[in-house]
């Protein structure tokens, strides 16, 4: 049976007090709506229909690369009205999941369970038991079976005591949506077309409404303001840290860790406080990440230790490598095994061979460095001439003295030595010594200037 996912994303988000549409507010490094689209794709939905309204052009532009059908809701006249807008493009057969762009964290497994129970009856929903149901639609049951959903403003005092609430997430046969949606009425306290009225229609048709409860309550929590956004962020990060610990990761403090993407971890990984992981990362066995590090789209192989406040973006790091503190690896940085990158060293678009070292205050850009070479403190590859980037090639077992400038394009041959303080503008042959500096001048018995007396 084919699956369509309908995502309601037309809300204005006034309480966010933001120029950014609510569904584009970031949570764990991804727009709220992006989380929902990701889950829809995980379900292998044949169709994803997203209903847009306020800030629609911005929303559509953000997800221009996604295979989505966009439907406009020019006037926000309720959730039922929003889904009515999809009828011209909604398939006649199959089922539809109805989700929300501001309810970002409902899990694939939960929705798969909802689909399974709904297939038996033609309609199903996710409900939740809460201590304080104020403001939510109540689930009215008779003999355990759902009879209706009553919105808070329309509920009697007795109905307001019910603690089972409607999350708004449904799975309904498309045939029934085509039958029920045109019949919706706005004769209620809000003057809106309630999607919840399809429940009463199902009961009138003699259908039993299936329901499930989510394993985690935050799966169905919506976001209306920045307080709720921050609270949901922390709940989600807490859950992600828990899952990583179950995979064998040790955190110095799981409450001070943010995962804003995905990470694949090996055995016995250790992560200190205030580490942020973004994009798609991979950490091998026995990797250690120091405090305050930021990793983005980076792979770090087994046994590597990263000291505090190092930043990685698009880097590939080999085994048993030592990095930091305060190192920066930019896109294109590729480090072989047993490399040492020390404090205040920046590496960009550069490969570094087995066992080579750059321990202090160095910039290595657009370079290729062989094995067992030593790059002295203060060395700079001068890769940019003001118009174009050029490559520096350093062979195996090369020794670059401190405070050297290597003006690309230039090649330093295997086994060569560059004297400290040199500005190298020409290739250096293998096994040779090259240095370039002004002649030292020394003056005996030199007297420093004295401060004038006032």
UniProtKB/Swiss-Prot annotation:
Region (Pyrophosphorylase): 1-226
Annotated compartments: Cytoplasm
Cofactor note: Binds 1 Mg(2+) ion per subunit.
Residues where acetyl-CoA binds: 377, 383-384, 402, 420, 437
Region (Linker): 227-247
Cofactors, names only: Mg(2+)
ATP-binding as UniProt keyword: no
Pfam families: Hexapep, NTP_transf_3
Reactions mediated catalytically: alpha-D-glucosamine 1-phosphate + acetyl-CoA = N-acetyl-alpha-D-glucosamine 1-phosphate + CoA + H(+); N-acetyl-alpha-D-glucosamine 1-phosphate + UTP + H(+) = UDP-N-acetyl-alpha-D-glucosamine + diphosphate
Associated pathway: Nucleotide-sugar biosynthesis; UDP-N-acetyl-alpha-D-glucosamine biosynthesis; N-acetyl-alpha-D-glucosamine 1-phosphate from alpha-D-glucosamine 6-phosphate (route II): step 2/2; Nucleotide-sugar biosynthesis; UDP-N-acetyl-alpha-D-glucosamine biosynthesis; UDP-N-acetyl-alpha-D-glucosamine from N-acetyl-alpha-D-glucosamine 1-phosphate: step 1/1; Bacterial outer membrane biogenesis; LPS lipid A biosynthesis
InterPro entries for the chain: Bifunctional_GlmU, GlmU-like, GlmU_C_LbH, Hexapep, Hexapep_transf_CS, MobA-like_NTP_Trfase, Nucleotide-diphossugar_trans, Trimer_LpxA-like_sf
Record's subunit section: Homotrimer.
The protein's name in its UniProt record: Bifunctional protein GlmU
């Amino acid at each position: 049976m084919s699956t369509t996912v309908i995502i309601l994303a037309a809300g204005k988000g006034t309480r966010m007090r933001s120029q950014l549409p609510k569904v584009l507010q970031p949570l764990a490094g991804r727009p709220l709506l992006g989380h929902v689209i990701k889950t829809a794709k995980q379900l292998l939905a044949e169709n994803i229909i997203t209903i847009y309204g306020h800030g629609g052009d911005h929303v559509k532009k953000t997800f221009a690369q996604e295979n989505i059908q966009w439907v406009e809701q020019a006037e926000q006249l309720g959730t039922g009205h929003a889904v009515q807008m999809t009828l011209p493009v909604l398939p006649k057969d199959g089922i539809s999941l109805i989700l929300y762009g501001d309810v970002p964290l409902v899990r694939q497994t939960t929705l798969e369970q909802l689909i399974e129970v709904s297939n038996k009856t033609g309609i199903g929903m996710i409900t939740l038991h809460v201590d304080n149901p104020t403001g939510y639609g109540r689930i009215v049951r008779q003999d355990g079976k759902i009879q209706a959903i009553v919105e808070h403003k329309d509920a009697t005092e007795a109905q307001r005591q019910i603690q089972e609430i409607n999350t708004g997430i449904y799975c309904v046969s498309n045939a029934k949506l085509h039958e029920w949606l045109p019949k919706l009425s706005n004769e209620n306290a809000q003057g809106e077309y309630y999607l919840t009225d399809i429940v009463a229609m199902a009961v009138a048709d003699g259908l039993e409404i299936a329901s499930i409860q989510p394993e985690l309550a935050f799966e169905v929590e919506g976001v209306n303001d920045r307080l709720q956004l921050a609270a949901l962020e922390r709940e989600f990060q807490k859950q992600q840290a828990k899952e990583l610990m179950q995979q064998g990761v040790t955190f110095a403090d799981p409450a001070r860790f943010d995962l804003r993407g995905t990470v694949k971890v090996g055995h016995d990984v250790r992560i200190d406080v205030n580490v942020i992981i973004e994009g798609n990362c991979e950490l091998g066995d026995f990797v250690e990440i120091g405090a305050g590090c930021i990793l983005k789209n980076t792979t770090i192989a087994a046994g590597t230790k990263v000291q505090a406040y190092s930043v990685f973006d698009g880097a590939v790091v080999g085994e048993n490598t030592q990095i930091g503190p305060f190192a920066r690896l930019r896109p294109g940085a590729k480090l072989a095994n047993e490399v040492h990158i020390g404090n205040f060293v920046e590496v960009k678009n550069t490969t570094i061979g087995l066992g080579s070292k750059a321990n202090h205050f160095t910039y290595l850009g657009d370079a290729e460095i062989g094995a067992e070479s030593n790059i002295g403190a203060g060395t700079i590859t001068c890769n940019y001439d003001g118009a174009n980037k050029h490559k520096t090639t350093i062979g195996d077992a090369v020794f670059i003295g401190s405070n050297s400038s290597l003006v690309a394009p230039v090649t330093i041959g295997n086994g060569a030595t560059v004297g400290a303080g040199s500005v190298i503008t020409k290739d250096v042959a293998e096994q040779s010594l090259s240095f370039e500096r002004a002649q030292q001048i020394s003056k005996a018995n030199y007297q420093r200037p004295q401060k004038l007396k006032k």
